Amino acid sequence: TGGFFNFWPTSLWDAAQYMYQQDYVAKDAQGNGQIAVSGHSMGGFSSEMALYLDETNYASTGYRIIRAGLSMGADYSWTSYLGLDEATAVATFGGRTVGKVCGQYDEFFFAADEPPTKSGTVYRKNYVATTAGKTLLEQENPQANTWYTCADGGQRIIYQPNEIHPWNHFSTASTKDAIEFYATAFSDQSGLHQSDLVLERDL
């Protein structure tokens, strides 16, 4: 596990800091970055850690680098070893737009209230109904695929597509969820003139 914990805890946070320094990355009037982080499985853990580390950094800098985060196929089971569980995550979301894609038949995660013996088996899970899901959405009876405005002013959602862990990479359901998430998170950025866009050029 030594190599495992050497990579993902800071990888997306490192990337976000690098991107923030680029002059083509938008910042608001207060210097907050208009950056979103997302990742699947281990990348999802890294996304969760990036939000946490960004909020820790905000305490000393006064600005946030990351505006939104969407993890896919990842809960807080591994980040908890680094002190980041659901309650800590909620306390450090800092008003950001935060979402999770939690496949109902994920083989590895989202069985928060189930006995450990069920880990690694394929059966239907309803993450929003678990203690963890309720904590993240700050609701007593949350529903999947539903936006909630939480105590810090940020919006949160848990998507629960009817799929297994690896499908989060490429399924039409997860792709739709990701597009919908970012359209919501950056809704105030719509209507940009084409001269304000930086596009890749085909060579």
Regions found by a protein language model. Give the residues of each.
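Soluble extramembrane regions of membrane proteins in the secretory/endomembrane system
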Residues: 1-199
